[in-house]
Design a protein with these regions (language model features):
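Compact, charge-rich alpha-helical regulatory domains located at protein termini
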Residues: 1-65
Length: 65
């Protein structure tokens, strides 16, 4: 899966995309260094979305905090 740094992966779903945008995260690179547990607390961000985001970050040598 290739995701540009200027967006979020489509596979995370609409609820997760909306929750992340409401929290101010609209780009993949903004998630680097953010604690995964903080993102998991957002309503709409579940295990599947976190896995997809983790994989997309790892493809770029980045990770959650």
């Amino acid at each position: 899966m290739t995701t540009p740094l200027d967006g979020l992966p489509r596979g995370i779903g609409r609820p997760a995309t909306g929750a992340l945008a409401a929290a101010g995260y609209t780009r993949l690179d903004q998630l680097a260094g953010v604690p995964e547990r903080d993102l998991a607390q957002l309503h709409g961000v579940g295990p599947k979305a976190l896995r997809i985001l983790r994989e997309a970050l790892a493809e770029r040598g980045l990770s959650f905090g």
